[in-house]
Amino acid sequence: MAAKDVQFGNEVRQKMVNGVNILANAVRVTLGPKGRNVVVDRAFGGPHITKDGVTVAKEIELKDKFENMGAQMVKEVASKTNDVAGDGTTTATVLAQSIVAEGMKYVTAGMNPTDLKRGIDKAVAALVDELKNIAKPCDTSKEIAQVGSISANSDEQVGAIIAEAMEKVGKEGVITVEDGKSLENELDVVEGMQFDRGYLSPYFINDAEKQIAALDNPFVLLFDKKISNIRDLLPVLEQVAKASRPLLIIAEDVEGEALATLVVNNIRGILKTVAVKAPGFGDRRKAMLQDIAILTGGVVISEEVGLSLEKATLDDLGQAKRIEIGKENTTIIDGFGDAAQIEARVAEIRQQIETATSDYDKEKLQERVAKLAGGVAVIKVGAATEVEMKEKKDRVEDALHATRAAVEEGVVAGGGVALLRARAALENLHTGNADQDAGVQIVLRAVESPLRQIVANAGGEPSVVVNKVLEGKGNYGYNAGSGEYGDMIEMGVLDPAKVTRSALQHAASIAGLMLTTDCMIAEIPEDKPAVPDMGGMGGMGGMM
């Protein structure tokens, strides 16, 4: 086992604070409407330009082990805030740096770190309650657009496109962000349920212009195994032909004789059918087939529940107003499913989202909810170069998370004003313990730091602006984008309450742990001896 370097007291705490400052100083320059860019070198490809706090934080590793521990703890503040609220990572980092800096003064002066931490925790709890009281609901498209714009570094186009997407697919709908093909941002909305499987044969195409197979008022057959024998399908095909309606077959696969017969029937105009593979794999495939069954009012024909393909009737088939099948996607529009059953299914999936542990599972379950509830919106981010597109995409994703958070817990005045106003809750907070009261004072001063940093990044004088904002009341604050004072909410400078709350809670949590640290242990790097040169190789005998 390698030897360890064990250090104690103020000296090692100072090293930890140095690490905090290096990381926080790199992140804080991105805060506010006039935040600067950070350029990150990449091992492959061009450099990455970003204004996203958590992206900057994740890139930082320091050479000194003790400084690096401090930096990694603040990195945790940024990534935790990002996980919970999706935005506010820079604010959280600035708050953590400020609480640590203020707190260290008191620890060095001989106050009890544990009591300081208790005071900080009590102050944060009071601030969180006050933030809940001053938050107002975020319902209108205009407010959603404003939140999106602020989060995307005052890019109004981004706010507008997110508000439009939310209007079209609902606040619960899935909105994804992709690379665009043009210079402008574009919004694509897929109505109905879409899954990523297309036709199994191009001979099913009946709309040559769009290169899709379009079925009006079709039946939908759902089967969880492969279909290769046409005899299994004949009874149900005959019933569909008598009804004179088209048929979509969704199965694990349709191959061989069965696929050939369907294609021939289609070409001759005997029966309009299209076959596609079922989406997903394994258990997810079964779940998605069940979703489609509920959406279309049919059942999944599965031997597991005692149903067989030969005995299927029209009652087992789902129905829809229209289905469009392309090369890679199938879209079911207006399924004939029962609304109450669809709602029950959505509620069941939401329950699964709450218990899911992995982000991937949550994302897939969220997509299923959106598909059942009515649509998916895709924001295609346009830019002139790949480097610009990456930077823009980061901002759009941040803005999307911020708007979701705003819809969830409401909005407060932006620009660091909400935290200043919430300080009113601390003025009469007395703990009965001098050291804990000092902890409250630490938070009282730290909540000024986001506004100070926003003003500094905009080239203003932080102390002058903070004093002027404190003289005002309510939502009165400083709009760093335009350089004006006034009602922040009326000026459209809004922050989601959830983002402000999580930034404060996570910053205080890690800062409190740092203040109560008295010993740090790191591995001593071993000097590995250089590999000796290989000895000369013996001469080779003459070759014939």
UniProtKB/Swiss-Prot annotation:
Ligand binding (ATP): 30-33, 51, 87-91, 415, 495
Gene Ontology biological process terms, A to Z: chaperone cofactor-dependent protein refolding; protein refolding; response to heat
Catalytic activity: ATP + H2O + a folded polypeptide = ADP + phosphate + an unfolded polypeptide
Enzyme Commission code: 5.6.1.7
Main location: cytoplasm
Complexes and interactors: Forms a cylinder of 14 subunits composed of two heptameric rings stacked back-to-back. Interacts with the co-chaperonin GroES.
Name by which UniProt lists this protein: Chaperonin GroEL
Underlying gene: groEL
